[in-house]
Each structure stands twice: as C-alpha cells, then as structure tokens.
A protein has these predicted regions:
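Solvent-exposed beta-strand/loop surfaces, strongest in extracytoplasmic domains of secreted
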Residues: 1-92
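A composition-driven surface/loop motif
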Residues: 91-437
Length: 437
C-alpha cells in the first residue's frame, strides 16, 4: 500500500525585520503546515542569536543576519521546501521605547523613539550624541525631579528628524545644560522642541539656585520655551546660566512670563549673549526682555549681534533687546551687522532698558543691514535707549552719533539713513539702514 503524504510548508510572517540594538528579544511568527520538527539558526551570531527550538531572537550586536528555520519530513508530511528565512537588520540606535530604566547616552550614541517610562535620560561627560526622532514627554510629578535630557558635562547634540523633549516636574528644564564651565552645543539639520516647567528654562538651568554652563546653537530648527518664570534659552527662576551663542540655524525662544526669550529668568542671571547668524525669534510674554534679562533684579552680560536675522519682543515692561522690568539690567548692547527688529509692547524701549531697569551702553554701527526698534509708551520710553523710569543707563551711540533724547530725529548721521513711523500716540519706530554710496 502506498502512503500519500500531505504537502507541508513553512513561512515566516515577515520577510524582513528591523530592530534597534537595545530592543527586547522577539519572535517572528512561523506558520507551519504539517507536523515537521523545526530548528532555527542565525547566520551571524555576533548580530543576533536564536533559540534553536523556539525561534526567539536575542539581539547582541549591530548589522545584518539571516534567521533560518529548517524543517524535516515526517511520516505524514513531506516538505518540498524545507527552509524559510528572513533578514534581520539591527540599527545601532538606542530605542528609548525599549528602555526599562534610567540611561546615560555614551559618545557616538544615536537616540530614537518615544520614552515609555518615567526614566532619567542623561548624556555622558564629553559625549557627542545624535537625537533622531525622539520624544521625551516628561510628566509634571514631584516624584521625578529631573530634566527631559540632562547633560552631565560638555555635550554635543546633533539633531536629525523631529525631536521633542519636555522636562519632568515644574522645576526642571527640557534640556539641562552641563555645569558651570562646560558647553552644550546643538547642531544638525533636524528640529528640536524643548519645553521647561513653570520655573525652568526650555534649554538651560532649572529652579532656585540651579546653574548651567554655556549654550551654543549653530544649526537645525530649535524651539525652546518656558511655561512660566524661566527663559526660553538660558536660566530658570532664581538661577544662572553661562554665555549663550547662536551662529546658525533657526531659533524660536519664548518665556510665558517674567523670563527673557533668550537670557535670564525671574531674579536670575546669564552670561554674554552673542548672535552672529541664523534666524532668531525671541519673545517674553510679560516683564522680561525678548533678548536679555528677566524680571525683578535679573541680569545678563553683554548682548552682541553681528549677523543673522533677529526678531525680539516683550509684550510689556521689558525691552525687546536689553533688560527686563523692575531693577533688572544688562551689559553693553552692540549691533554691528544683520537685520534686527526689536519691539516693546509698553513701558520698555525697543532696544535698551525695560521699565525701572538699566543697560550698560548701546552701540549701533554702520555695518548693519537694518535695525528697527519700536516703543509703545510715549511719555518716557525711547525706541533705542531708555525705558520708563530709567535714569541710570549708559550712553547710546548710533554710527558715531550720541543720542540723548527719545525725540532724536537722526541729526548727525552720515553713514545711516534714519526714518520714523508711528501707528498711534504711544507708538514710535526708528528704522536705520545703510546709506547707498
């Protein structure tokens, strides 16, 4: 008697699988027709190993390997094709979604994915790390007192794709820059949105005595904001940060209230602010400067703009570029290049001091492309110079001409054109452009 065997077959659910190097063990389901016995093997065990009987794959390295299932004929079934296989590619990136605890990124790491747990993610001292489509959405919970991303010392962050980082708990920034004396550098072609809590910067330092080193942005699209009393980029409430340098990229920085868009937070300080390139938009909701110092005795170092396109505004009481409201200060303001538009909603100067505050000095040279400054308080504030109730600030020099009044009409200028415009009794704009030879 001739026994006719059934026609057996095997096939994997997926012909190819992509994983990250820290992903958990997995199984690509195998469909079996018949009762044959299957064994599994990996073509490159340095990339991944496979359990010979269950098919569970464990990732051990990066690269590509082929996982093969082999089946044998039985008394009941014959298999014309006795093997099935799929290609496994293991990306060297660290998948945040696969983490089961805190993680310190090392030099060369690529971070990707969405953080699933309430874990602290840090960057090791001196490490260069790529952020590639990450999401860290910190919960506002006192049990998790850390930033969305914490730099332990000097750090270089390259951004690719779209990235979003939010601090945990209200006292912590989206990205905590390293300690005093270190530098955080952000570059790349992607985007980064960094959001701090009520009392912290978007990028910089946190709350009440917190500090950080220097912050440099030279590429990418960076959006940084504080939900309350911190700067968008710089220091948090009653905190400090080092120098802030922007040489390229597109930067949007904002504080909801009391902090500067770029600079210091409420009762806080920051170092020098230098902008030499890029597209920069900075704003304060109330009482802080767009670029400069925040509210209530805050300070910042010198503000220097040599290039790029800069738009800076304060909704009320702070200067567009300069100092915030109520006993705040900034150092020397120098604008020698680029296109600048600075506006104070009320009581502050467009460029200079906020209400009841001071600046060191203002120097604008003939090397600019255009400077436009607007005040919105007629009785005292200057478009470029002093805000309301400022009796102590330094000199204002525009292309070598000393400006001594909010009523200046451009007299004495030889290298710059001067124009005024107004949209109402409180509003006054000065516009400076180079004279064409």
């Amino acid at each position: 008697m001739t026994v006719v065997k059934g026609e057996g077959s095997i096939s994997f659910a997926e012909a190819s699988v992509e994983k990250y190097k820290n992903d958990a063990a997995f199984t690509n389901p195998l469909t079996i027709v018949g009762d044959g016995v299957v064994t599994y093997e990996s073509s490159d065990p340095t990339v991944a190993t496979v359990n010979a009987t269950s098919g569970e794959v464990t990732i051990v390295g990066v690269g590509t390997t082929t996982i093969t299932a082999t089946i044998t004929d039985t008394d009941e079934y014959a298999y014309e094709k006795k093997t099935a296989s799929y290609e496994l590619s293991v990306d060297p990136a660290i998948n945040l979604a696969a983490l089961s605890g805190d993680y310190i990124a090392q030099n060369g790491d690529v971070l990707t994915g969405t953080l699933a747990g309430n874990y602290k993610i840090s960057i090791a001292a001196g490490a260069s790390v790529e952020l590639k489509d990450i999401t860290i959405n910190g919960v506002d919970d006192e049990a998790y007192k850390w930033a969305g991303l914490t730099c332990l010392y000097d750090a270089n962050i390259t951004i690719t794709g779209a990235n979003s980082v939010k601090g945990f708990y209200e006292d912590y920034p989206g990205i905590q820059a390293g300690p005093v004396g270190t530098t955080l550098t952000i570059s790349g072609t992607g985007s980064l949105t960094a959001t701090g809590g009520d009392d912290a910067a978007g990028i910089g330092s946190g709350y009440d005595g917190a500090s950080c080193g220097d912050i440099t942005i030279c590429g990418g699209t960076v959006t940084a904001s504080s939900a309350g009393y911190g700067a968008g980029i710089g220091s948090g409430y009653n905190a400090s940060s080092g120098a802030i340098t922007i040489s390229g990229g597109t930067v949007y920085a904002s504080s909801s209230m009391d902090g500067a868009g770029i600079g210091s937070g409420h009762k806080a300080s920051c170092g020098d602010i230098t902008i030499s390139g890029g597209m920069v938009t900075a704003s304060s909701g109330d009482w802080g400067a767009g670029i400069g110092s925040g509210f209530s005795g805050s300070s910042c170092g010198n503000i220097t703009i040599t290039g790029g396109t800069v738009n800076a505004s304060s909704s009320s009481y702070g200067a567009g570029i300069g100092s915030g409201f109520s006993g705040s200060s900034c150092g020397a303001i120098t604008i020698s290049g680029g296109t600048v538009n600075a506006n104070s909603g009320q009581y502050g100067a467009g460029i200079g001091s906020g209400s009841d505050s001071t600046f060191g000095s203002i120097t604008i040279t003939a090397g600019i492309t255009q400077v436009q400054a607007t005040r919105n308080y007629a009785t005292a504030a200057w478009p470029i110079g002093k805000g309301f109730s400022d009796n102590d600030s330094g000199a204002v020099s525009i292309a070598g001409v000393t400006v001594t009044s909010k009523d200046w009409d451009g007299t004495g200028l030889t290298d710059l054109n001067f124009a005024t415009s107004s949209t109402g009794s409180n509003n006054l704009t000065w516009t400076l452009t180079p004279k064409v030879p």
